[in-house]
Amino acid sequence: VDLDDLLEKGERFYKLYHDSLNFVTPGNSNVDSIRMMVIVHYTTTWTAYGGGYDDVIGALWVNPATMKPVGQTIAHEFGHSFQYQVYCDDPNKEAGFRQGQSGTSQDGNSFWEMCAQHMAWQNIALFPEWNCDVPIYLANHHRGFMHEWLRYQAFYLMEYWRMKHGEDMLGRVWRESESHEDPITAYKRIAGLSQDQFNAEVWESACHDITWDYPLGGYLRRIVDRQSEADRQTWYTHKT
């Protein structure tokens, strides 16, 4: 394992999520006094989990195969560590979307995954070969937001939020969320939007998807342009 690569990129991920995306509030976070830990398990079993310890501090567990080189996987899982930290830092223990899709803690929550992908995407200059799962997104983008089939791919609406409201908007949605609140309900409340206004934003966001009209859209356009016409047609064909 190239530990220097892990430390260098890990520090960059940390700085982005801490200083720019504002998943924590300096001066009011446990990270002010406690270090997040990265635990490397020397096993051949694929291991890449972001979370934390005892609702106190975020952490990351990985094995060597996930770090050759350090890239999207570590950036994504480190995102989970910061998502975990949101609940740790909330004195009321309400923020951070700890509930699952059904409103309980017994099932998954795709918002965690799509947000971690969005956080990783902000670092794509460090791993430009990542294809962002564009084929899966193009074949399924007609599905609803937070659909389980798009839990790793549907992060472009959050990029629209970043463009419209600023780099820290996603962090605000996490930090200012309320217990068992739906992520979209939280966003509408924080942004002060009615349902009709939110619907208009979804339409505008979809318009950006047509040509990948985002600050990092050049990476996506290159992914599509490298493919054959037949492959592109397959990507754009909805199977259901």
Q: Model-derived features: where do they sit?
A:
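Beta/coil-rich, acidic/histidine-enriched accessory regions frequently appended to metallopeptidases
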Residues: 180-240
